[in-house]
């Protein structure tokens, strides 16, 4: 274990102890599980401990924690895994057992809908495990970990058994070991598993099977649906009595459990194994059927692919012009055909495509009827399908933006593909060969219903396109008529009909939806006429939904208005209010979907608001961000990560789905509502380093209210908590000293007060205080005080830290004092090649020196040599000096502050005190506007 730095213990079980550790070789935090020292001499238990690790290591699935290393020749034996922040399903269930009322956030976490999503992931994992010939044999909530970002992971493979192994390997061994040591473990010589989750035949000694794992899943599902056990075990109770199980809807009528789900769970809990599901795949399929719905479709229209009576064929289009993000050659031209008929409100399209058509790319679109003939066909929804190297990719496109993508490997010999597109109950689905590939929910009123097809060769469509209508839509929605008027921009007529619906359906879903669409109609009308009064009317209409069942729609509507007006602070505030106040309302899913769309929209336009929506999406819809998008986002954030002090001082990389990423996004966006949640999470984990990062961020953003309120809370927490002697990065006493320094800094107290007790601080905390002090001193014309601070702190940090973090401020201090010779001497500490490298601090510092000692034209010439696509905020002044200048719409809150500080120094060196002072005033008055 010498390779790892142990940070603290995070769990303890029957045979093992789990620690949070740091792996310096791979620069990452890991979970290290080792056998208990008092059991390490028992060869049988050691063999079983290693067997658990090897089974887990052989499984590759998102629902199984991968094993990094297994050390069987060390003493004690151990293995390592990724560290996942989260909690067990048992702890979540336990938090709501026998509770009469629940907080809103906990009620949402334990809703039937949320639990079904979790259970589906559990089934997927067990389905995979069974396909590998392995039985878990101890499935229970205590062995299911729920990550902070929607991960669902099955733990503890100590009882797992391969089908090739004899069950006697564990159950028929007689080992005499003190019973007190094994209160929390499966004991050799006894039936393996947890009795409350065992099938009746298993308790009678029958060997484990897939059916017994299915029974355990049934118990878990019953708990999820009812928040209680399917039976109550009493001493002396016979096994047969256990199966007097009540239906879930009878046990928990307030949970509104659908009868279908009740049938599913009762089948999984059948006393007779022959009456249970034959496989986990069958159980999972029924859960999917409930989650997705299974409508009956009736053929209505057949669109003959080459019949001009059915289609209007347009001139060939260059697809890369309209969909630049799609995988198409920029030189390829495609045929575009728009149907002459409009589809139904709930519609299914069926067609068969040749492989050749998919290799070239095929698009199916639902563009608005307005403007289709004038090049606006790409507005609306659609799917783009493309095969490359036996990988079939499906992209969901909205208004020209790719907002979702799914890719899977396909059979290289397959030549035809049956494809179905469904639009039903706000849900868009794409099915390929009867397998659902993509599902998306859209709740805004549809704008038109014509069908568009984009393909290189129409002959690649085998036969015709069949349009089917849902049996559920045979009764026309009362909203269809005003929706048609809205689609044709007949706003007053649409509003009149919507109001009639509101009056006819008071307190019902149809009435609330009509009220929401009145606001949409007013918004569209105001946007078309640039009518400021119209925007106010739209806001007033959305306000009528306040405190109703459809209350989330009030804030969704207001967010749409503020987005059109460019008032992004108010837009985000509206969305956040909906997400916080109404997290249990059914309509909240519409707000979540809109957040995800706005994230893609902002990223595509490179707008500064993208950081805020990335943060919101991580909180409310993390499952909507796939692995390739994660990688893309991390690439976009590379420069910001490099220029963030708390990231630089932490040698482990920033994971996308982590608390540190949330803090990073808060820091650069200036969006701080989630700091409280991060504070509470870090305190629960006793992660003092993370707490220091949070307070540093709040101080740098000028959030004095947070520091004043939560420094007191943290002090009280530390005072009333008994701390164990675990290994930690930063001690509680050091954190308290750091808080005192922060408070002195916010109160503008003396330098001695700010750095009082510095000799007791960790170097990380010293550098945090110095960075905050130096920025404040610089912008307020106290550059000479930076030198005093350097003299105070340099003896407590390493030479490398002094060079990297203190030297740039030392140069800036002498620039403020206009000591050109000293500045040049200090610049000589950098390699001269770094003077022209815009990723280096020396690049900008050299530009400042040129402005001070040489000529302004030379300074502008040097700084304008910065790459226009530079990703490093430290070089923003270079982009500012370039011929094209800088677009502030693309700068986040923190980037705008850094640019003001850089311009402040630059104009000071140029001797332009008027512009310099303007920068200082703007810096001091800079509100955290998005």
UniProtKB/Swiss-Prot annotation:
One Pfam family this chain carries?
Answer: Pkinase
Note the Gene3D superfamilies from the entry. Phosphorylase Kinase, domain 1, Tetratricopeptide repeat domain, Transferase(Phosphotransferase) domain 1
First-tier enzyme category under EC: transferase
Q: List the disulfide bonds.
A: none
GO MF annotations in UniProt? ATP binding; protein serine kinase activity; protein serine/threonine kinase activity
The Enzyme Commission number assigned here is 2.7.11.1
Post-translational modification comment from the UniProt entry: Autophosphorylated on serine and threonine residues.
* Highest taxon of source: Bacteria
Q: Which reaction does it catalyse?
A: L-seryl-[protein] + ATP = O-phospho-L-seryl-[protein] + ADP + H(+); L-threonyl-[protein] + ATP = O-phospho-L-threonyl-[protein] + ADP + H(+)
User: Which InterPro entries does this entry report, sorted A to Z?
Assistant: Kinase-like_dom_sf, Prot_kinase_dom, Protein_kinase_ATP_BS, Ser/Thr_kinase_AS, Ser/Thr_kinase_PknD, TPR-like_helical_dom_sf
Known role: Together with the serine/threonine kinase Pkn1, may play a role in the specific interactions with host proteins during intracellular growth.
Q: Which family does it belong to?
A: Belongs to the protein kinase superfamily. Ser/Thr protein kinase family.
The name this protein carries in UniProt is Serine/threonine-protein kinase PknD
